[in-house]
Design a protein with these regions (language model features):
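PLP-dependent enzyme catalytic core of the Aspartate aminotransferase-like
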Residues: 11, 53, 237-245, 252-290
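Phosphate-binding glycine-rich loop
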Residues: 1-9, 228
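Helix C-cap/helix->beta junction micro-motif
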Residues: 27, 58, 90-91, 242, ...
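Substrate-binding/gating loop at the entrance of the active-site cleft, primarily
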Residues: 1, 12-31
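Active-site phosphate-binding strand-loop segment of PLP-dependent enzymes
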Residues: 38-106
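Structural signature of PLP-dependent enzymes
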Residues: 153-159, 176-199, 231
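Conserved glycine-rich beta-strand-loop-beta hairpin in the small C-terminal domain of fold type I
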Residues: 174, 191-199, 211-224
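Active-site PLP attachment segment
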Residues: 117-153, 166, 259
Length: 290
């Protein structure tokens, strides 16, 4: 609402977190999409030619960038980020970099913020929060880093009406960052082991499924299109046929997501195993009937 007028557009990479689309729709702004390129091993890459073509649209005003990317789990390399940044700067666009998953990366890796490669670009806004890292979404607390002084002042005025910080949320966030380090490292190790468990299960029980272990997030992005080619609504199928609630498909992830499901692996491994076994049984039953 603050950055875009009614005839201007925002750009998303797809698949995309659905609430990026919802935010644009709420503000009455049209959306451009640039599909990520899918590779045979399940990984994704930026289609730089398409991305630049969309940025060059005279109506494009803002890029929603997700780093690390949700739902694919990509941690963009410094080279990728620099190429994206160069395109954004060439067309003088605003960029909102959603980095909420930046703490939830595989052990031994290091997050590269967009701010590192756009060190002096004034139209960068970075969004982070303790809520994913420490499972504190109920705090409704986040860190919004706005470089442009005029925009920051406008945001602060708007914040007086819609975003007053709860003192308890602020205290909880400070405590999490100050004292949660050891817990956070143990969490990352457990998540890494969960991803390895799911990867091995799928390779053994559902070899048609395509999944790679993402560099970041606690979310597995799994291609089940070869397992269930005739099922159009995978979340509905698994809810009703397996008793498993999950997310997937274009309805939530905007586009470029047909045949995919997103699995939350931030839970005890025994629960993950039960869910996977239910999914396997439902898939095998569906395959046998068709």
């Amino acid at each position: 609402e603050t950055l875009c007028g009614p005839d201007e557009k925002v750009l998303l990479n797809t698949p995309a977190y659905g609430y990026f689309l919802h935010a644009a729709e709420y503000a009455g702004v049209d959306v451009l999409t640039s599909p990520l390129h899918k590779k045979a091993d399940g990984t994704f890459a930026v289609d730089f030619e398409d991305f630049e073509r969309k940025c060059a649209d005279p109506a494009c005003k803002l890029v929603f960038w997700c780093n690390p990317h949700n739902p694919t789990g990509r941690m963009w390399t410094e080279d990728e980020l620099r190429r994206v940044a160069a395109i954004i700067e060439e067309y003088n666009l605003w960029v909102v970099s959603d980095e909420i998953h930046c703490d939830l990366i595989r052990c031994g890796r290091r997050h590269i913020p967009m701010a590192k490669v756009m060190d002096s670009y004034p139209k960068l806004i970075t969004c982070m929060a303790p809520t994913k890292t420490f499972n504190m979404a109920g705090l409704a607390f986040s860190n919004i880093i706005i470089r442009d002084p005029a925009l920051r002042a406008r945001y602060q005025e708007r914040d007086k009406l819609f975003g007053m910080v709860n003192p308890m949320s602020l205290t909880a966030a400070q405590a999490a960052y100050a004292h949660g380090g050891a817990w956070h490292e143990a969490l990352k190790q457990y998540l890494d082991e969960n991803f390895a468990f799911v990867k091995a299960f799928l390779a053994r029980e559902l070899p048609e499924a395509v999944m790679y272990i993402p560099e970041a997030t606690y979310l597995a992005w799994v291609d089940l299109s070869r397992c269930l080619p005739d099922v159009s609504d995978l979340p509905d199928f698994f809810a009703n046929k397996a008793g498993v609630l999950l997310e997937g498909g274009d309805s939530l992830f905007v586009g470029n997501a047909k045949g995919y499901v997103r699995l939350n692996l931030a839970m005890p491994r025994a629960i993950i195993q039960t869910g996977l076994e239910r999914m396997r049984d439902a898939i095998r039953k569906e395959q046998a009937e068709h």
